[in-house]
Structures are given as C-alpha cells and as structure tokens.
C-alpha cells in the first residue's frame, strides 16, 4: 500500500484532485485550469496510479487521508 513517504503528487495532480473533491467533471476542471479534458484525465489517472486506487473518489479520499491535498 502506498504511504506518505512513497507518494509525491505534482501540483497539477493535486489541483485536479481538489476539484474532483468538489464534484467537478473533467470537462469543468479543464475549463477552470485552462487545459483539455484529456489533460485533466491524464493527471487524475496518474494520481490514481501513484495512490494505487481504482476510482476518482478513492483517490481523493486516500490523498486527503495521506494529507497530500488540503
């Protein structure tokens, strides 16, 4: 299981997860961050891989628990 010492999320991955936590879609996050929906999905999927999760919700919960997002 990934723990705090092993996991480093990029600033963009953290930004995307914060917006996912607010319930925003990838499209809406892309509009907010001025990037494409595919770019948002890329960052979210990278965070999911790093945190060894299988859903966006699990990823946000684990990132919050590990204090990777505030």
Please describe what each predicted stretch is.
Residues 1-15:
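Regulatory hinge/linker segments at domain boundaries
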Residues 2-4, 46, 63-64:
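Residue-level signal for pocket-adjacent positions within structured domains
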Residues 14-21, 48, 60:
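Hydrophobic residues on short alpha-helical segments
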Residues 21-24, 66:
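Short helix-capping/turn signature of helix-turn-helix
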Residues 25-58:
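Recognition helix of helix-turn-helix DNA-binding domains
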Residues 56-66:
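Short, basic, alpha-helical segments at the C-terminal edge of helix-turn-helix-like DNA-binding modules
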